[in-house]
């Protein structure tokens, strides 16, 4: 469910050493399955463990996950990264905003999941996003761009060289992608 790197475990163990004996960590998602989902890690003293929690035992600690958060923390990773600028704890939870869909789910759901979990986080760096409008009977994914992607001069490259290649690689049943957006260049446009 959750992978915690050795460096992150060591960091948590150091923090836990100054807490009440038996205190571990809790990993959770607030507003799971929504665009406002946020992940967090907190101390979990022994009296805060619920019977419905999942206990994930690691070498140096135990991480507790509540039953509501559990499906949204599938494939989550926690790491402790150190570079020239210092150290930071990172928590990546690709399914926090949308539950992972089954491999045999309808094509529309699988494409939507990939857009939300893999493509949109990349576009968000430019203030952009893409929405799946439909999949045609001919096998084309019809997309609409928003935010910084709307009116961006690089949108065709993003569509064909980025999004289309990733989608066709993952979903061979698709024939391609088409852009439905009425692009209007403005202050919001990234390029």
UniProtKB/Swiss-Prot annotation:
<dbReference type="InterPro" id="IPR001075">
    <property type="entry name" value="NIF_FeS_clus_asmbl_NifU_C"/>
</dbReference>
<dbReference type="InterPro" id="IPR000361">
    <property type="entry name" value="FeS_biogenesis"/>
</dbReference>
<feature type="binding site">
    <location>
        <position position="152"/>
    </location>
    <ligand>
        <name>[4Fe-4S] cluster</name>
    </ligand>
</feature>
<comment type="similarity">
    <text>Belongs to the NfuA family.</text>
</comment>
<dbReference type="Pfam" id="PF01106">
    <property type="entry name" value="NifU"/>
</dbReference>
<dbReference type="InterPro" id="IPR034904">
    <property type="entry name" value="FSCA_dom_sf"/>
</dbReference>
<comment type="subunit">
    <text>Homodimer.</text>
</comment>
<dbReference type="Pfam" id="PF01521">
    <property type="entry name" value="Fe-S_biosyn"/>
</dbReference>
<dbReference type="InterPro" id="IPR035903">
    <property type="entry name" value="HesB-like_dom_sf"/>
</dbReference>
<keyword id="KW-0408">Iron</keyword>
<keyword id="KW-0004">4Fe-4S</keyword>
<comment type="function">
    <text>Involved in iron-sulfur cluster biogenesis. Binds a 4Fe-4S cluster, can transfer this cluster to apoproteins, and thereby intervenes in the maturation of Fe/S proteins. Could also act as a scaffold/chaperone for damaged Fe/S proteins.</text>
</comment>
<dbReference type="GO" id="GO:0016226">
    <property type="term" value="P:iron-sulfur cluster assembly"/>
</dbReference>
<dbReference type="GO" id="GO:0051604">
    <property type="term" value="P:protein maturation"/>
</dbReference>
<dbReference type="GO" id="GO:0051539">
    <property type="term" value="F:4 iron, 4 sulfur cluster binding"/>
</dbReference>
<protein>
    <recommendedName>
        <fullName>Fe/S biogenesis protein NfuA</fullName>
    </recommendedName>
</protein>
<feature type="binding site">
    <location>
        <position position="149"/>
    </location>
    <ligand>
        <name>[4Fe-4S] cluster</name>
    </ligand>
</feature>
<dbReference type="GO" id="GO:0005506">
    <property type="term" value="F:iron ion binding"/>
</dbReference>
<keyword id="KW-0479">Metal-binding</keyword>
<keyword id="KW-0411">Iron-sulfur</keyword>
<dbReference type="InterPro" id="IPR017726">
    <property type="entry name" value="Fe/S_biogenesis_protein_NfuA"/>
</dbReference>
